[in-house]
Amino acid sequence: MSKGTSSMGKRQKRTHAKCRRCGSVSFNVHTKQCTSCGFGKTSRMRTYKWQAKCKY
């Protein structure tokens, strides 16, 4: 098992596909979870407080 240049040529499969719920290309095909909206992991939309700009 090498982790250098020779193994970089084997990386040609798609990791992320288009999500059914949010439409962004962030649905992981292997884990079956969307990193943008959380589809496949939770029924609620994925959102965090730190995503919004802080208003002072």
Swiss-Prot record:
Keywords: Metal-binding, Ribonucleoprotein, Ribosomal protein, RNA-binding, rRNA-binding, Zinc, Zinc-finger. One of its GO terms (molecular function) is rRNA binding. A zinc finger (C4-type) spans 19-37. GO terms for biological process: translation. Gene3D superfamilies: 2.20.25.30. Its cofactor is Zn(2+). SUPFAM superfamilies: Zn-binding ribosomal proteins (SSF57829). Pfam families: Ribosomal_L37e. It comes from the Archaea. Binds 1 zinc ion per subunit. One of its GO terms (cellular component) is ribosome. InterPro entries: Ribosomal_eL37, Ribosomal_eL37/eL43, Ribosomal_eL37_CS, Ribosomal_zn-bd. Zn(2+) binds at residues 19, 22, 34, 37. Binds to the 23S rRNA. Belongs to the eukaryotic ribosomal protein eL37 family. This is Large ribosomal subunit protein eL37. It comes from Methanosarcina acetivorans (strain ATCC 35395 / DSM 2834 / JCM 12185 / C2A). The gene is rpl37e.
